[in-house]
């Protein structure tokens, strides 16, 4: 990820700081801050456990959806490699699709910003939540988050306390709620 940003490749910059390896990304459809790998995966080398067939499969084969794929629902096998389609946008990001990032940097939803600014902002936000591994901080060790932030109607979002984090969505009648806030305020601290 750092290499992609340093070399002006856009499409994964908002996933900075997520722990793990490339081969695991299709399983969870890893993502964060408005980006997910299904947006940039073109094909995957896949060894089907059931048939023993080694084949290059298109992204559609994995039935990606929000933090989900067929690999979590019975499709078993080994991922050899993943091909990503990244974009060269003169050092700019893809249009930002995260209310958290746009609020953090003071930009409009859909803005294209310098890749390094997006990466730095994501790392800063993730660090503030204890979600970036730091050598001298044992509390930062994490395997990443496996929950999804719930999306509710705007009217439903008004039923939650005002101090709860929430972010606007492209559909103005929808609001993304902070799963982390909900979990911590249900009595399960970090």
Stretches found by the model and what they are:
Residues 54-190:
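Phosphate/pyrophosphate- and phosphate-bearing ligand-binding catalytic cores of soluble enzymes
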Residues 1-51:
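Anion-binding (especially nucleotide phosphate/pyrophosphate-binding) glycine-rich loop
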């Amino acid at each position: 990820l750092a290499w992609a940003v340093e070399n002006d490749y856009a499409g994964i910059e908002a996933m900075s700081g997520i722990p793990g390896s490339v081969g695991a990304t299709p399983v969870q459809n890893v993502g964060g801050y408005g980006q997910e790998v299904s947006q940039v995966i073109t094909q995957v080398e896949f060894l089907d456990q059931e048939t023993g067939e080694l084949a290059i499969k298109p992204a559609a084969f994995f039935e990606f959806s929000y933090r989900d794929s067929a690999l979590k629902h019975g499709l078993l096998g080994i991922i050899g490699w993943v091909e990503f389609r990244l974009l060269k946008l003169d050092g700019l990001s893809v249009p930002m699709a995260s209310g958290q990032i746009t609020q953090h940097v003071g930009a409009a939803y859909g803005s294209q910003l310098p890749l390094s600014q997006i990466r730095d902002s994501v790392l800063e936000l993730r660090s503030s939540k204890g979600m970036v591994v730091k050598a001298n901080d044992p509390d930062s060790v994490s395997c990443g988050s496996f929950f999804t932030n719930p999306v509710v109607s705007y009217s439903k979002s008004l039923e939650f306390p005002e101090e709860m984090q929430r972010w606007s969505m492209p559909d103005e009648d929808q609001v993304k709620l902070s799963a982390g806030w909900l979990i911590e305020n249900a009595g399960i601290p970090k």
